[in-house]
Amino acid sequence: LSKRYEGKLDGDADRFIDRTNQNVLRMQRLINDLLTYSRITTRAHPFLPTDCNQLVQEVVEMLQPVLEESSGRVVPEPLPTVMADGSQLLQLFQNLIGNAIKFKDHKPPEVHIDAERADKGWLFSVRDNGIGIDPQYAERIFLIFQRLHTVDQYPGTGIGLAICKKIVERHGGEIW
């Protein structure tokens, strides 16, 4: 409709069609995120040796346009090879790095990623210089559809960190 009737209707109609298109795109993102969330356990791949350095590099390449636009940068330290579902770890890094870039203040985003040996495996850390999270909301942000900001302030579906939590738990870990 927007292509067919662009400029042929009055301003109100154009705004209505534009708003409808935006809502359709938002609904499409929501459905895709819900499918991703539901498939974490139902369409999971077996755990294989997975190079986390390679995964982070892939995510940085995927997010390069956003990084350039925001003058942001990702600073990974050497990361381990772990037994994991590689596609899910890719999604995990993409969501965490993407959030670090999105939830920024006036400074260009800078995301640091590292890992250190822990008792039962590895402790990964994704830190940034963004707006931060009030400690009182630390658990709430990992619940599905929970947002701390309006869609107008920061776009998104409110599912990304719930996906992260489900992936981490499937891999026997915790996220905070």
Range-by-range predicted roles:
Residues V111, A115-F124:
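Short beta-strand-loop-beta element adjacent to the nucleotide/active-site pocket used for signaling
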Residues A100-I101:
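Short helix-loop "hinge" at the ATP-lid/N-box region of the Bergerat-fold HATPase_c
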Residues P46-E61, H112-A115:
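A conserved beta-strand-to-alpha-helix junction within the catalytic ATP-binding
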Residues I133-F145:
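Short conserved segment of the HATPase_c
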Residues V168-E169:
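Detector for a conserved hydrophobic position within an alpha-helical segment of the HATPase_c
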Residues G172-W176:
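Glycine-rich ATP-binding loops of the HATPase_c
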Residues G160, C164:
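Short alpha-helical Gxxx[C/S/T] motif in the catalytic ATP-binding
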Residues Q22-M27:
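Short alpha-helical segment of the dimerization/phosphotransfer core of two-component systems
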